[in-house]
């Protein structure tokens, strides 16, 4: 999973993403379920935070079917982020990801990024009048 975000390579997502994959946080971006949804998420991250965006693994924990990943996202704000125009600023933000592995693949995925710290590094931008609604 981390490799996909770091390289942008998603042609192999069927190997590690379950057909019923869901990350509820992506629904507001029009990204739904399954391996193609994960590939869309990778594309969105790279379009919003640049091709230079990368995740660094801090710690990975496993308990039964659950995996908890402590990560840091590094990037540069180059695309629209919930209605906020690009600032071109660099940032790093800690994240926690919780995933359930089913049939050897990631099926359930939640993530909690540090929105407050990230926005502060981006200069605390506001959405423009267009907002984030389609």
UniProtKB/Swiss-Prot annotation:
GO terms for molecular function: isomerase activity. The keyword Chaperone does not apply. The active site is at residue 111. The keyword Isomerase applies. Its EC number is 5.5.1.26. It catalyses: nogalaviketone = methyl nogalonate. InterPro entries: Cyclase_SnoaL-like, NTF2-like_dom_sf. Keywords: Antibiotic biosynthesis, Isomerase. It is an enzyme of class 5 (isomerase). Pathway: Antibiotic biosynthesis. Homotetramer. Dimer of dimers. Involved in the biosynthesis of the aromatic polyketide antibiotic nogalamycin. Catalyzes the formation of nogalaviketone from nogalonic acid methyl ester (NAME), the last ring-closure step in the biosynthesis of nogalamycin. This is Nogalonic acid methyl ester cyclase. It comes from Streptomyces nogalater. The gene is snoaL.
